[in-house]
From Swiss-Prot:
It is found in: Secreted, Extracellular space. Hemocyanins are copper-containing oxygen carriers occurring freely dissolved in the hemolymph of many mollusks and arthropods. Its main location: secreted. GO terms for cellular component: extracellular region. It comes from Homarus americanus. Keywords: Copper, Oxygen transport, Secreted, Transport. GO terms for molecular function: oxygen carrier activity. Hemolymph. This is Hemocyanin subunit 1. Belongs to the tyrosinase family. Hemocyanin subfamily.
Length: 31
């Protein structure tokens, strides 16, 4: 149902947030 889709979307958003929040650290350390 829609709840499963919403739950998947939420976990995907959380994963994306984790990844994007780590990007600046790695980017600046590479620089």
């Amino acid at each position: 149902g829609t709840t499963v889709v919403a739950h998947k979307q939420q976990s995907v958003n959380r994963l994306l947030y984790k990844v994007t929040s780590h990007i600046p650290d790695t980017f600046f350390s590479l620089k």
